[in-house]
Amino acid sequence: MKTEDLITMLAAGAGAVEAPSAAQRYALAIGWGAAGATLLMLALLQVRHDLGLALLLPMFWVKVGFVTCLAAGSLFAVLRLSRPGAKTNWVPAALGLPVLGMWAIAAFTLIEAEPMERSNLFFGDTWKSCPLLIAMLSVPVFAAVLRSMKDLAPTRPRLAGFAAGLLAGAVAAVVYCLHCPELGAPFIGFWYLLGMLIPAAVGVLLGNSMLRW
């Protein structure tokens, strides 16, 4: 075999290697980001001391399910917005249904509760810190997701930044569930959502500058 033929064959083989898909990129970004958020939570907040008992409570899993569904919906939005011309018809439903479901549970809880208990169900004991802590834990996830998104082709940078921030906030909220003692549906439906919307708002601001072609 001639040297020129060998070089041509090797070049053709190298060109056949496919770049990672968008789903693979984001899976890796979420994995690394979630690991960073978990380490941050363990270093600064620690796992709640009664986690074993909390795992037996249905409302704990409702809380985890809510933020996990929002993370899945946000990932769907991120994948759609990373492709030029991709349809986003189902994005509002993917993001809105988990929120509406939690708000329905929260409304039922408040209606059934005694008037004196409603304030505690909404504010809990950690309303001042909860949104800020979720936003703090979202930083590693947000950085990883935003880095992956920059390598793709979002054509609506502000909306893409919002979706990236919401995904980061939702993944951070899943991690925060291991620390947070709150189980009231009204608390989760408002303060958790606020914590996830903080990085989403930051994503809107950063998207126009960092994700523009």
Swiss-Prot record:
Primary localization class, coarse: membrane
Alphabetically list the UniProt keywords. Cell inner membrane, Cell membrane, Membrane, Stress response, Transcription, Transcription regulation, Transmembrane, Transmembrane helix
**Which residue windows are transmembrane per the record?**
27-47, 51-71, 91-111, 126-146, 159-179, 187-207
Give the knockout phenotype. Growth not inhibited by chlorite during aerobic growth, slight reduction in lag-phase when grown on minimal medium with lactate and chlorite. Up-regulation of the SigF regulon (Dsui_0156 to Dsui_0159).
| Superkingdom in the source lineage | Bacteria
Q: List where in the cell it is found.
A: Cell inner membrane
What's a single GO CC term here? plasma membrane
Q: How is this protein situated with respect to the membrane?
A: Multi-pass membrane protein
Factors inducing expression: Part of the SigF regulon, induced by chlorite (HClO(2)) under control of SigF. Part of the probable sigF-nrsF operon.
Question: Could you tell me which InterPro entries the record lists for this protein?
Answer: NrsF
Describe its function: Probably an anti-sigma factor for extracytoplasmic function (ECF) sigma factor sigma-F (SigF), which responds to (hypo)chlorite. ECF sigma factors are held in an inactive form by a cognate anti-sigma factor.
Record-stated family: Belongs to the NrsF anti-sigma-F factor family.
Give the protein name, as stated in the record: Probable anti-sigma-F factor NrsF
